[in-house]
């Protein structure tokens, strides 16, 4: 395993997560499947590191959480992610990498083009739909943020509430998925070894990202996020 590359990936992923409110898995999963023995172990590592990156923000601002906006989509996510995690344990790694690449590109095109013209209202059907998509993408690719972001952007009253909603959603979702991944045998010594290198990078990236977050407008944050989603998708397809 290339420990230096792992450190840099974790650093950049944590930075993006803190600035954008999502994206750790989107960024790191373009590379982690090639650094870990199996795809399932890669998703496990990505989920644990993302959980570490979101825990401080979620706990620090827990009083600002509007649970009415969070609970329905979170419950739907939990249900839909279970089957997806089981699928990872029996699916071909190369197939999953190709699917991941396509999903990343589709997600980036959605955010760059369609989301400018389609307004998402924070209704129960929207929460169920976004929660289902988020669960599938989280279980398969450790990137359950993009689908949920559309919902949180629509219902959050400001940038600060948006970030605390997404961070709490990612934290609780990753805790749940970690249990299922342990059950499927994806928490291995290789994951533990990689975590020791990644956790320090996550701490640094989160700290730097918190400084940048307060200086950027929401529009700039969105554009940066959409661009790297597309790049990650292309890289995943090329390297699969």
Go through each PLM region and give its residues.
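Membrane-embedded helical hairpins/re-entrant loop segments and their flanking transmembrane helices
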Residues: 106-164
